[in-house]
């Protein structure tokens, strides 16, 4: 019986600690947030361009390997 009573208190204590932690956290300003979003967008764009370039280079190489001169 006492274990059933402790579960809600554990949960409420856990939620209370989460609330206190989130209040103590320092949130970024609008300028810092926009700078972070821009950096993430540039990084994602760079990875997309890099993936496209690798695919573009490997397609002709794959076609050369697959279509060997001995096969018709």
UniProtKB/Swiss-Prot annotation:
Q: Give a Gene Ontology cellular component term annotated to this protein.
A: endoplasmic reticulum membrane
Stretches in topological domain Extracellular: 62-72
Could you tell me which residue ranges are on the Cytoplasmic side of the membrane?
A: 1-40
GO aspect biological process, one term: intracellular protein transport
How does it sit in the bilayer?
A: Single-pass membrane protein
Q: Would I find Transmembrane helix among this entry's keywords?
A: yes
Transmembrane regions: 41-61
- Keyword line: Endoplasmic reticulum, Membrane, Protein transport, Translocation, Transmembrane, Transmembrane helix, Transport
Compartments (UniProt record): Endoplasmic reticulum membrane
Q: Tell me a Gene Ontology molecular-function term this record carries.
A: protein transmembrane transporter activity
Write down the InterPro entries for this protein, in alphabetical order.
Prot_translocase_SecE_dom_sf, Translocase_Sec61-g, Translocase_SecE/Sec61-g
Write out the function statement from the record: Necessary for protein translocation in the endoplasmic reticulum.
Q: Quaternary structure?
A: Heterotrimeric complex composed of SEC61-alpha, SEC61-beta and SEC61-gamma.
Q: Family, per the entry?
A: Belongs to the SecE/SEC61-gamma family.
- In Swiss-Prot or TrEMBL terms, this protein is called Probable protein transport protein Sec61 subunit gamma
- What lineage is on file? Eukaryota, Fungi, Fungi incertae sedis, Microsporidia, Unikaryonidae
